[in-house]
């Protein structure tokens, strides 16, 4: 009797698993769409292909609701596939444009760093910036826009650090020189007044 109960329980569990397997929620598609969505938002590409982004967001939101409510996995999968395709379109259209803008911005920042001679004062950050710039140019040459954008964002970060570190040191030096000049003038005045 015990054996029959055990086999019946296993059989029911097996039937339940088989019946549910055909209608499982599309978690892989959800993960893929979420990854593409996160990239789009991280790089702030929403406005480069607004229509596609809106389509992606609408489909993604509707699919998320279906998944949360554990309803209609087939429709959720279709919505997530549509969302992923739209997010990919936004990335494909937006990343090259964003990379071009960043390249222009980093050219200005590189010039500022060179003018202030950051390569002498903050050599580490300056060299990291230049290395990332070369990597960005290489990535642009192979149309790897995501890598180019990441490198160009690093260029901005490192050149900014190098520039402001150098500026701070120059400002401190200028202040010290001004104070020294004031002290020298004060001493000269004292010497003149004492020699009379």
What are the functions of these language-model segments?
Residues 20-196:
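Long, charged/polar, soluble alpha-helical segments
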Residues 1-8:
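Bacterial N-terminal signal peptides that target proteins for export
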Residues 9-17:
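Bacterial N-terminal signal peptides
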